Amino acid sequence: MTIQKFLAMKGKEKIVMVTAYDTPTAKIAEEAGVDIILIGDSIGNNVLGYDSTIPVTMEEIIIHLKAVRRGAPNSFIVADMPFLSYGHSIEEAVKNAGILIKNGANAVKIEGGKFHCNLIEKCINIGIPVMGHLGFTPQSINIFGGYKVQGKKEDSKKTILESAIALEQCGVFSIVLEMVTEELAKEITEKISIPTIGIGAGRYCDGQVLVFHDIVGLNPNFKPKFSKQYANTYSIMLNALKEFKKDVKEKNFPKERHTFKGGK
């Protein structure tokens, strides 16, 4: 998969993106044939036990990026730029983006609007593809005051639309639209020539992304409205561990077939 192929898919074939955080989930994603694997800073909420994405560090992204690349050697991988890996200085941000590329990413994702255009242009000029991210941007959760749908009011709608146009002009190859009204997502998708990938952004984006753990049901207490659970893996894993515990306690495991014998 290449950026040129993604661009050609706009308006013709829906783009499928999922998160993956380790080698096993990456292997599953690649075998399923998804178009893009995202090493999201959502690793903070879903794997590392943080309350938000804000504590996630470059070092943590890199460790999991390497694991995902080993599990999905043939996939197009986008890595999130975590909080404070950009925004302080363009030079530092470009260096961090380059580190992610060197460690296996095909592109990086940067949250925020036209404020970051100088950074995005700098990255692209030295060969680092960039995916944008507008609407609800999790790294700004303290400003938003929680998980809130964006683009309901005219001023918010205008800002997001203008930012989408600006991001296209400065060279991003696609834009994630998160938790924005369906009407706004449709308008943006129709007004820009690059693909939009929605998460809680309705039916009219050029593609969709969901968190792996939400898809397979590994987060029993977190079921956002915009997501869909396709399996209840949490229950399957829980029951397996309970069965293992029961077998050990009742001396039903291991059996003779699980043991090794001495001899020549």
From Swiss-Prot:
The gene is panB. Mg(2+) binds at residues 41, 80, 111. Catalyzes the reversible reaction in which hydroxymethyl group from 5,10-methylenetetrahydrofolate is transferred onto alpha-ketoisovalerate to form ketopantoate. 3-methyl-2-oxobutanoate binds at residues 41-42, 80, 109. This is 3-methyl-2-oxobutanoate hydroxymethyltransferase. It comes from Thermosipho melanesiensis (strain DSM 12029 / CIP 104789 / BI429). It catalyses: 3-methyl-2-oxobutanoate + (6R)-5,10-methylene-5,6,7,8-tetrahydrofolate + H2O = 2-dehydropantoate + (6S)-5,6,7,8-tetrahydrofolate. The active site is at residue 178. InterPro entries: Pantoate_hydroxy_MeTrfase, Pyrv/PenolPyrv_kinase-like_dom, Pyrv_kinase-like_dom_sf. Its EC number is 2.1.2.11. SUPFAM superfamilies: Phosphoenolpyruvate/pyruvate domain. Homodecamer; pentamer of dimers. The lineage of its organism: Bacteria, Thermotogati, Thermotogota, Thermotogae, Thermotogales.
